[in-house]
């Protein structure tokens, strides 16, 4: 009887713990703002994971077997990986998949700063898990190619599958300038593609156009540094390779190159955004600004799957401007944008 009574108390206690956990989860989800933050975290996590799995997988093909992989294949893998990532999370978080893009949007007032750590944490975890996935899928191929050794440099190096490394013909600071400039061009063109008041991509084509931008950057300037242009792309896989057995050389190689793909893109994206706003964005007449947290704010995104409907407000993704088609004299007859998605992207 004593044992039975103890068992009942144990069962009752476990049930109380279970219900308290469930109640806590429900309490978290009852707040709209907290629910939105969780959704955006998961969206950045999944979109970055999708982009990196396709991108790193294409690099693995190029490194491990020239018959199945190529440099062009790597560019297409990352480019179309971005497309899939945008479709995974564009309407939820904007599918930045890039900490430099998130930082720039926060610095320029397009995204609240409280979302910055949420987005970046999701991006880093997604990138780390993608590296772990590629390692698991290509484990035997990696060992076969390298003779059982996990090397960072040399003809049988495999660390480059997961992260970028400074080539022999580049110096550290030339590499820094290269990464800064490429990320500057990336952000400038992203603002161009998504500015509804300028000459944006056609409704429903933004994901594809952005992937074309990524491919163009990679095929035209990839030889110098491997074009990280994304703080969420390099450090997490480097951390994984350090844990998996490649050793501390993943950080020390190339004159301690590891920090450049973090700092240079942050600087470059910020400059690219400012350059666009000063030289292009400021010259375009716009309606009064409505902040994201305003009661009147509805959406600040880009249509991926446009639908026909009534003339509802259109939102400029560049400055979060709410523009009604009914009161714009300069707007020609065109189908309205509806069901829009946020994209201040990668």
Curated annotation (Swiss-Prot):
Transmembrane region(s): 41-58, 72-89, 116-136, 175-192, 205-221, 258-279
Site (Selectivity filter): 78, 227, 233
Extracellular side: 59-71, 137-174, 222-225, 240-257
Record field: intramembrane: 94-107, 226-239
Pfam family of the protein (one): MIP
Listed PANTHER family: AQUAPORIN OR AQUAGLYCEROPORIN RELATED (PTHR43829), AQUAPORIN-7B (PTHR43829:SF12)
Functional note: Aquaglyceroporins form homotetrameric transmembrane channels, with each monomer independently mediating glycerol and water transport across the plasma membrane along their osmotic gradient.
UniProt subunit comment: Homotetramer; each monomer provides an independent glycerol/water pore.
Name of the molecule in the record: Putative aquaporin-7B
UniProt organism field: Homo sapiens
Lineage: Eukaryota, Metazoa, Chordata, Craniata, Vertebrata
UniProt gene name: AQP7B
């Amino acid at each position: 009887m004593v044992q039975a009574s103890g068992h009942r108390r144990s069962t009752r206690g476990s049930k109380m713990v279970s219900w308290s956990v469930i109640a806590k989860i429900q309490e978290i989800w009852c707040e709209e703002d907290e629910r939105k933050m969780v959704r955006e975290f998961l969206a950045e996590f999944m979109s970055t994971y999708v982009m990196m799995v396709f991108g790193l997988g294409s690099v693995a093909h190029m490194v491990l077997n020239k018959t199945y992989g190529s440099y062009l294949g790597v560019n297409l893998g990352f480019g179309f990986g971005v497309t899939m990532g945008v479709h995974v999370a564009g309407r939820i978080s904007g599918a930045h998949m890039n900490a430099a893009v998130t930082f720039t949007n926060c610095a320029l007032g397009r995204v609240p700063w409280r979302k910055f750590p949420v987005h970046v944490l999701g991006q880093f975890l997604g990138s780390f898990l993608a590296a772990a996935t590629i390692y698991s899928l290509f484990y035997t191929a990696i060992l076969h190619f390298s003779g059982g050794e996990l090397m960072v440099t040399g003809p049988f190096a495999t660390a480059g599958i997961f992260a970028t490394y400074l080539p022999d013909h580049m110096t550290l600071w030339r590499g820094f300038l290269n990464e800064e400039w490429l990320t500057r061009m990336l952000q400038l063109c992203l603002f161009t593609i998504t500015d509804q008041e300028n000459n944006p991509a056609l409704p429903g084509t933004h994901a594809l156009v952005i992937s074309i931008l990524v491919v163009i950057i990679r095929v035209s300037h990839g030889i110098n540094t491997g074009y990280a242009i994304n703080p969420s792309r390099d450090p997490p896989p480097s951390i994984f390779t350090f844990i998996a057995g490649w050793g501390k050389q993943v950080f020390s190689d190339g004159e301690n190159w590891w920090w450049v793909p973090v700092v240079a893109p942050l600087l470059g994206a910020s400059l690219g955004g400012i350059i666009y706003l000063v030289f292009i964005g400021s010259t375009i007449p716009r309606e009064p600004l409505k902040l994201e947290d305003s009661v009147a704010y509805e959406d600040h995104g880009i249509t991926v799957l446009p639908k026909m409907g009534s003339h509802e407000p259109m939102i400029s993704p560049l400055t979060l401007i709410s523009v009604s088609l009914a009161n714009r004299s300069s707007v020609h007859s065109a189908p309205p944008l509806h069901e829009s998605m946020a994209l201040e992207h990668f």
